Amino acid sequence: MGLCQSAEDKELTLKSKAIDKEMMQNHMSQQKVVKLLLLGAGECGKSTVLKQMRILHDHGFTAEEAEQQKSVVFNNTLQAMTAILKGMEALRMTFDKPIRENDAKFVMESHKMLQEAKVFPEELANAIQALWNDKAVQQVIAKGNEFQMPESAPHFLSSLDRIKLPDYNPTEQDILLSRIKTTGIVEVKFQMKSVDFRVFDVGGQRSERKKWIHCFEDVNAIIFIAAISEYDQVLFEDETTNRMIESMRLFESICNSRWFINTSMILFLNKKDLFAEKIKRTSIKSAFPDYKGAQTYDESCRYIEEKFDGLNANPEKTIYMHQTCATDTDQVQMILDSVIDMIIQANLQGCGL
């Protein structure tokens, strides 16, 4: 009899907890807004993650918004070739075909052509494509870590046949890869599992960080994004500082800040696709001279994870790490679903459930 009563009590307790949990989720949906803060150094991929959240949970981009992105894509395409030409000069490389010098001069003087452009100018597109097909330009791209080459350069420059068409409309991938510097605060709102989320992206370059303080109050979780592929690159705003080291310094200050003692900390080691290619050519020793492991993806990535984890001064705080490719919508969806589930559970536990 006692055993039967115990089993009944257990079942009643489980039902009670399930009801409590459902009531709390309903309560959260009515009164609780979960605030997420996206942090990271400049060009780590925060804005791309935010765009993915819009695609996955906020109905994506309207036709009007896609149309507005055309000018960004046009400028990114021109900026990509301009950066490569500056890189060629810095590396003292010459064109395979000397006639390309005329195209280079034309491109470097063409920024005003895009100011009001509704269609990518044909003459400019032809010059960029001629340069893109030059063997020396392809060799410079392989040395992109030695100068400030946009990571989207190969995508946009190889897509000019499509981008220059009169009826061109940016694809989802074009929008994900397009970039303008984030200044101030960008917000995305969405609802998932009956919970309202507000996600903030703030400027990652040094001059923007003083503005982060306005986002700090009542933050439920931080998604810190570090570009794992940038271990051999320097900052845009300070070419004496390694990007990976800067990212680790920033992570340490955020992770151990008094503002975030009770805040869930999620680390996205982003651009894993670029890291996988780069590690075949260049060891992480450029950022970590003490590294003794093999020049492989798994071992190098594990070492970097341990480095970040070691920056956490609170033994009771767990850093939830994920290796990500922010431009891969399917992978981002899987990781974001896992992260959001974890955040919801953490909030329920915080309410005693």
Curated annotation (Swiss-Prot):
Residues 197-206 are annotated as: G3 motif. SUPFAM superfamilies: P-loop containing nucleoside triphosphate hydrolases, Transducin (alpha subunit), insertion domain. Residues 35-48 are annotated as: G1 motif. Residues 174-182 are annotated as: G2 motif. GO terms for cellular component: axon; cytoplasm; heterotrimeric G-protein complex; neuronal cell body; non-motile cilium. One of its GO terms (molecular function) is GTPase activity. SMART domains: G_alpha. Keywords: GTP-binding, Lipoprotein, Magnesium, Metal-binding, Myristate, Nucleotide-binding, Palmitate, Transducer. Residues 32-353 form the G-alpha domain. PROSITE patterns: G_ALPHA (PS51882). One of its GO terms (biological process) is phototransduction. A lipid is attached at C4 (S-palmitoyl cysteine). Pfam families: G-alpha. Mg(2+) binds at S47, T182. A lipid is attached at G2 (N-myristoyl glycine). Residues 266-273 are annotated as: G4 motif. GTP binds at residues 40-47, 176-182, 201-205, 270-273, 326. Guanine nucleotide-binding proteins (G proteins) are involved as modulators or transducers in various transmembrane signaling systems. Promotes transcription of 3',5'-cyclic phosphodiesterases pde-1 and pde-5, leading to reduced cGMP levels in sensory neurons. This causes suppression of insulin production and signaling which leads to increased daf-16 activity and contributes to increased adult lifespan and resistance to oxidative stress. In addition, by reducing cGMP levels, inhibits TGF-beta signaling pathways. This is Guanine nucleotide-binding protein alpha-3 subunit. It comes from Caenorhabditis elegans. The gene is gpa-3.
